[in-house]
């Protein structure tokens, strides 16, 4: 009985302690009744994206930007293209016609296509093209820069940014 009470008290203390470590990011979703055109900021140092309406941050989330050697370029951009079901033309896998993967994690500029295979581009849902091959899209967000230069967002967040964007939406990427 004493052990179970101690375990319960220890568990509660851990929960209270860890709740103080919670991130200051708001929950996924829009806050308030902010109006005005949307614009986005991407903070490469903090690995964070913010969606603004006017001057108010209405949504923010963690992101994963370009890893070493594939840096996401800082600068001022505008959404050039929206593609709900985009696939990469550079990164993906070489597969047999039945879609069985033969060579994963392919860069078509560096990896020669084996005979009898087809290239299947990596899926990039909710794609917003910013510059050339750089864009924002849903993808794995491990908590550090890990992409080939794009800005990866959690799936639910990518949808929020996609829905808020129009071609021409300003995007500031800062260090």
Model-based region annotation:
Residues 12, 86-94:
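Hydrophobic alpha-helical targeting segments used for export or membrane insertion
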Residues 12, 57, 145-147:
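A generic, residue-level signal for flexible/boundary positions that often mark functional hotspots
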Residues 21-80, 87, 101, 174-175:
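Intrinsically disordered, low-complexity
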Residues 9-19:
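Bacterial N-terminal signal peptides
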Residues 84-86, 133:
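Short, charged/polar surface micro-motifs in flexible loops or helix N-caps
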Residues 21-33, 74, 92-175:
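Exported/periplasmic cell-wall-interacting domains
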Residues 1-10:
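Bacterial N-terminal signal peptides that target proteins for export
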């Amino acid at each position: 009985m004493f052990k179970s009470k101690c375990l319960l008290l220890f568990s509660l203390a851990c929960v209270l302690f860890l709740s103080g470590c919670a991130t200051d990011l708001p929950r996924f979703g829009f806050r308030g009744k902010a109006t005005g055109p949307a614009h986005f900021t991407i903070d490469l140092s903090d690995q964070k994206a913010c969606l603004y309406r006017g001057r108010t941050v209405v949504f923010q989330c963690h992101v994963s930007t370009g890893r070493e050697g594939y840096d996401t370029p800082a600068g001022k951009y505008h959404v050039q293209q929206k593609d709900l079901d985009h696939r990469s033309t550079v990164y993906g896998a070489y597969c047999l016609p039945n879609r069985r993967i033969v060579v994963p994690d392919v860069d078509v500029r560096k990896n020669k296509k084996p005979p009898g295979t087809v290239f299947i581009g990596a899926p990039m849902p909710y794609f917003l093209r910013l510059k050339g091959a750089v864009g924002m899209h849903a993808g794995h967000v491990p908590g550090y820069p890990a992409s080939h230069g794009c800005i990866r967002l959690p799936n639910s967040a990518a949808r929020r940014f996609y829905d808020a964007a129009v071609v021409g939406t300003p995007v500031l990427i800062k260090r």
